[in-house]
UniProtKB/Swiss-Prot annotation:
Enzyme class: transferase
Chain sites annotated for binding Mg(2+): 460, 462, 464
Catalytic reaction list: RNA(n) + a ribonucleoside 5'-triphosphate = RNA(n+1) + diphosphate
Co-factor: note: Binds 1 Mg(2+) ion per subunit.
A Pfam cross-reference name: RNA_pol_Rpb1_1
Binding site for Zn(2+) 1: 70, 72, 85, 88
Protein name: DNA-directed RNA polymerase subunit beta'
EC number, as in UniProt: 2.7.7.6
GO molecular-function terms, A-Z: DNA binding; DNA-directed RNA polymerase activity; magnesium ion binding; zinc ion binding
Amino acid sequence: MRDLLNLLKQQNQVEEFDSIRIGLASPDMIRAWSYGEVKKPETINYRTFKPERDGLFCAKIFGPVKDYECLCGKYKRLKHRGVICEKCGVEVTLAKVRRERMGHIELASPVAHIWFLKSLPSRISLLLDMTLRDIERVLYFEASVVIDPGMTPLERGQLLADEAYLQAIEEYGDEFDARMGAEAVQKMLKTLDLKGEAIRLREEITGTNSDTKIKKFSKRLKLIEAFIDSGNRSEWMILEVLPVLPPDLRPLVPLEGGRFATSDLNDLYRRVINRNNRLKRLLDLNAPDIIVRNEKRMLQESVDALLDNGRRGRAITGTNKLPLKSLADMIKGKQGRFRQNLLGKRVDYSGRSVIVVGPTLKLHQCGLPKKMALELFKPFIFGKLERAGLATTIKAAKKLVEREGPEVWDVLEEVIREHPVMLNRAPTLHRLGIQAFEPVLIEGKAIQLHPLVCVAFNADFDGDQMAVHVPLSLEAQLEARALMMSTNNILSPANGEPIIVPTQDVVLGLYYMTCERVNAKGEGMLFADINEVRRAYETSIAELHAKISVRITEIDPSKPEGEGETTRLVNTTVGRALLSELLPPGLPFELANKNMTKKEISRLVNICYRRLGLKTSVVFADRLMYLGFRQATLSGISIGVNDMVVPKEKQAILADAEEEVKEIEDQYASGLVTNGERYNKVVDIWSHTNDQVAKAMMERLGSEEVYDAKGNVVKQQTFNSIYMMADSGARGSAAQIRQLAGMRGLMAKPDGSIIETPITANFREGLDVLQYFISTHGARKGLADTALKTANSGYLTRRLVDVAQDLVVTKDDCGTTRGINITPFVEGGDVVEPLRERVLGRVLALNVYVPGSNEVAIPASTLLDESWVDYLETLGIDAVKVRSPITCETRYGICAACYGRDLGRGYRINIGEAIGVIAAQSIGEPGTQLTMRTFHIGGAASRTVTTDRIEVKYKGNIRLHNVKIVQHDSGKYVAVSRSGEVHIVDEQGRERERYKIPYGAELSAGDGDTVESGQVIATWAPHTHPVITEVAGKVRLQDFLEGSTVERQADEVTGLTSLTVLDPKQRGAAVKELRPMVKLVDETGSDLCLAGTDIPAHYYLPAGAVVSVEDEAMVGVGDVLARLPQESSKTRDITGGLPRVADLFEARKPKDPAVLAEISGTVSFGKETKGKQRLIITGSDGERHEELIPKWRQVNVFEGEHVEKGEAIVDGPPVPHDILRLRGVEELTYYIVNEVQEVYRLQGVKINDKHIEVIICQMLRKVEIIEPGDTSFLKGEQIDKPRLLEENEKMEKEDKLPARFEPVLLGITKASLATESFISAASFQETTRVLTEAAVTGKCDELRGLKENVIVGRLIPAGTGLAYHSERRRKRRMLEQPESLTADTGTSHYGEDEISESGAATA
């Protein structure tokens, strides 16, 4: 018996390991793994079904087919364990060794491993410094290669085709050595002196200036050094021995009818063995060279197919014409080993069923069908039955359960009590997609789900299914209850707002309840308290909507007992008074005394959570839900066709619009406007008309005239069902009602362009055939979009998770004072997101001072909560420096201070929180709501583009930023700067709005002036770009030759003439080099200079400029010399929605990007080249930078103008890499955060900036070496920042030169693949490439991230698993250095000292 126990113990001995290394296997190693050579291609004997000896399933090599039984049947039973049968040679042991024991094939001729040959960049060709094409020619026997030239003039590595080879042999005899095939390559690799080569390359790199050469040498040097350091030998990339996979991993399964289903690998192995055996025979027979060569080539091809089918040439196909699945295919892709079996597994103790609504449940409950519960909790029930003495053995308990007697149900109730279960709805897009509930047993077969958690699960009851999982161990139950319980997940981790908010029916009920009705029964009554109101309502003395007055008592919980009570009389309605009964003490009555729309209810829950905590909020939310459902039922709201009221004014509005359109068509016919303009204007008119109709309709729907008690006519909000549903936020929107009762409006074609004939009908009136046909366009595109969108969104989420998965909070505080400045977010002049919302939950990096003094208002390192941001607002501060994940200085991970508040919990983040994954989920989860559409500037969009003035919305003072102004003779100010801004600041010094001031704008107010609301402070011509003079003087036109460089044009309408500069392309050769320019001279004719400089006032004019001054005319400061017409007709696609977010995170270069100034300095134009203009910036220190810009791009700057580094010279979308290089990390952060937020904001999705910053932080993980110093890195190499910093510290300790570096921005896909962990990268994408690279360099995976640990089957180093990992490391250190045991206990920063021994063991 003890023997048996020992045997069982042996089986589950798990090795502790800290890291995983991958490398190349040497032939000896492969032979050591093997239990015998596979010599025959046979698999099993089809008569006896026994494996053939020496075949692919041989029992002698791989082990017995049945447990403890040899093949011939001489030895059976456990007692013969370990005996090797002398008859059939099979060891008597467990059959599962057939999953572990490998075999091998001795190849008759060496074969190149296709991964190292064809996976780009080809390692073999890089190492030998030959082209891949050449190496392939050698390998596949098309040419010979010179291995050792001896004394001949041939060179090592030179290729000789057949004729050349014969000729060389004739000439030199056997002086030289040249071969073909894998032997040749192997010999070359063997004879390569790696160390010498490395030294030579290092010298060459320092000795050359050519960038391409440095790049090439560096690549090779890196590979060579990797081989030297890793202990891999280069000749191991050529296989002499081929390992054979254990047979149970490539099974052969008998089907009915005597056929077999087999793994494709068996076919591939059979081909290899067949060819190998044939080659051996041919070599033994000394067959002619050409036959042997052909056989060798075929062997090479069959090994290629086994390792990676289809990588070279045509893929080998099976009987069904599909390519066979090779070893490489087994591990890559969605169905490969990584993603199918290691990252996602099927789990026991789980079930799934359809969900139905459970409106009577409490928030922490879910209804579990009895049948399901019985099945899921079976082992628990068996145990309980046995302990209770109701069954003697497990078998008896099983019988009891199968009978389903009454005692079983009693036991089930006990087992389930307080044992949480986890519910999950696929797709699990964020962490709220799995939550824990306490099960309540119910009849029926459907799971009941609490309505308030539907938002988090994104569940509806139209046939959705959910899965149930049972946490088994005590720790699992504890975590489920403490961390995953639905009552603990009230806030959304994406934005920190409540996600447990009533929707749909509940909102409708509460809204209906809190409406007012004029002249309702009981209006004007006075009540002593709310109970009296309830009695009046229940006895039908007062209606729900009657306006009444009632005395209420409010309690302030912050005051001591008995002091916080206040009583007052309030005007309200019966419904609102009844609603206020639910308000927990401490919430003012004001919060409920209004129309409860969805927004208001959400606010109410939020305030409740912030003021009164979790428990109160949960109870309150539940009670709100019950009341909402009840009132929605009582209200009897439903939709009828008569609720859709078409406004009477509609016909008149449409007639007006048609009139306007006709007018424009006439203008077009007479040639006054272009086709593009006509189209834009028509679209404009119709979108405007649509708005007007919608407005008229909403007025009709939303208000009605009624008589009040005195008989006067008053307006009140209607009780129209459709309007109430939309207004409350329960269902539908104004846009949908507009289609029902207004007009459908303009439709888009599938390519996104707008059809200019609108649909004037609505659904209530019905569409005619043409209108219906136009509608189908958009509808069909919508459906196609949705399908694509889901897939794209899922892929984006996957990339985001992959790039951020290893980012965990590992420290309390890294102690940095760096951070990023946060200002209110402004769009179109409006403050869209005030400062308080942006800094809430962040930690201050620097002290905040009271404005105008040096008194510290809020000290640094304060976590800004609601009360602090309120204080910030009263101070009127408009910019704050806060800590950010991007500036965090923690080596591995991020510190809690740089992250700030845990949005899903509302307090400072815990150590061990997996913020990377949370960030990825928060950005990816709303992805499906984003549109896929790319908008053309047309319709509604074009109206916002052509602004021509700044109109102030708030009263306040003007502050100008970087604006250069000249004063015109008329007293007006004219802006002559490009990136100027005007801010409007109120009395408290808070910024209310801000606007960009374009070049050439006329300002009517100066810095510090006070302006009123609605005042216009700046105007400009929207469609032209002026050239403005900054000095007064006389005009000289230079190089103006009418008919060659300029032409005179007369305006038909006004009759005035003007000069237009011609495009150099259209000029004759003689005048091509001339550059028309306006010079300003004084009376004597000498050049005037710009104020305060010695730069002459020369204004070069680009092609297309219209000159508005004549030669010798006098001009004053601020006058317009010329105008450049802006091309507004070009419709640029604005990429919107999901593709835009993906582009930003992938850091892609946009089309026609902005050109930024590389250095600060003065602009001048150099000699033009074909199609390009040369722009030169000269710095103050004489540094020059040249930029070639295509002629058709419009340059923003003029000759002699000063530009700052990073300023845009040519407009366009900026390249993120340029922003990083020229303006730094902080500017890049602003750019990406704002651009991403803009997309989400359009869809009304709120995401905290922190999440985007976390992803940017991961995109900036790598740095590029500029100067390697004394480190072993190479110039231009990309290194992980922590690794570089460690190396630099080492250098500084040894008084050597550290490396200089600059940050690089990688797109998320690149960043994921460039991660230090090869396991994580391989499981993401491009598995073959990643594994090839890792094997050659002998990479070691430290298993730091989450993904790697999931793959090796451990707890993840985040959350509660962090303690387990640090404990494991600590024990490890104790084993390694027992003498320093006492000193070592307090070193780790995870605080693992609190974790007991048992805790670590069980976790």
